[in-house]
Regions:
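N-terminal glycine/serine-rich phosphate-binding loop of ATP-dependent small-molecule kinases
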Residues: 1-94, 119, 147, 202
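Gly/Ser/Thr-rich active-site cleft segment
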Residues: 9, 117-210
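Short loop segments at secondary-structure junctions
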Residues: 20, 87-88, 113, 140-142, ...
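Short, small-residue-rich loop/turn micro-motifs
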Residues: 27-33, 107, 162, 208
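Secondary-structure boundary motif
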Residues: 61-65, 112, 139, 143
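Carbohydrate-associated surface elements
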Residues: 100
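Hinge/lid segment of periplasmic solute-binding proteins
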Residues: 104-116
């Protein structure tokens, strides 16, 4: 038995399948979005995990025996989020989502000052990417930013809560504007221009890796 998780911006969906990919049960929980200011779009990461556990409870009621035989969990989720994490593995405030536009000025500045970085990143800087948002946080919420020890992306927050592992895959890394596409690793240059030298970035694995 396997579980597939998809953390979307409007809901988290959980599916229980057998070894033949037959869907046995399905659960979905809505996720609220907060918009504290014009152009801002945020969610509470702890609400994601609460919704996940609630969905697990539903599946356990529907298929208790099958849930006890689960061998693995696959994770997917929305990209480009910025979640600041403290030294106790708890989020510092809300996650800033991909459709948040507060870092428009920072994205424009990065493209103007460092045009050569677009080739390394594989794309120009955009407001929804993690790197520009980290630059915005360093300038506009410096106290919160200084508390942060590392960052995570959406699905990787759930991985941390489920396994205690701080990690990501190349897909989320590539969408962060902190990643060198050719070298397939975090770029010190990107990290520096986004004022994020003191942050620890998660270990990167290929997407199919357990």
């Amino acid at each position: 038995m396997y579980i597939g998780l998809d953390l979307g911006t409007s809901s988290i969906k959980i599916v229980l399948v057998d070894r033949n990919d037959k869907v046995l049960e399905f659960s979905s929980r809505s996720i609220p979005t907060e918009r504290p200011s014009i152009g801002h779009s945020e969610q509470d990461p702890n609400r994601w995990f609460e919704a996940l556990l609630d969905g697990f409870d539903e599946l356990s009621l529907k298929a208790e025996k099958d849930m006890k035989r689960v061998e693995g969990i696959g994770l997917s989720g929305h990209m480009h989020s910025a979640i600041l994490m403290d030294s106790t593995d708890e989020p510092i405030g809300n996650a800033i989502l991909h459709n948040d536009g507060r870092a428009g000025k920072e994205a424009h500045e990065l493209n103007e000052k460092f045009p050569d970085l677009a080739e390394k990143a594989g794309v120009i800087a955009m407001p929804g990417f993690t790197g520009p948002k980290l630059l915005w946080l360093s300038r506009n919420e410096p106290e919160k930013f200084k508390q942060a020890k590392y960052i995570l992306f959406a699905k990787d927050f759930l991985r941390l809560k489920l396994t205690g592992t701080v990690a990501t895959d190349v897909t989320d890394a590539a969408g962060s504007w902190l990643f060198d596409q050719k070298k397939r690793k975090w770029s010190e240059e990107f990290i520096s221009v986004c004022n994020s030298d003191d942050l620890v970035l998660p270990s990167i694995f290929e997407s199919p890796n357990p």
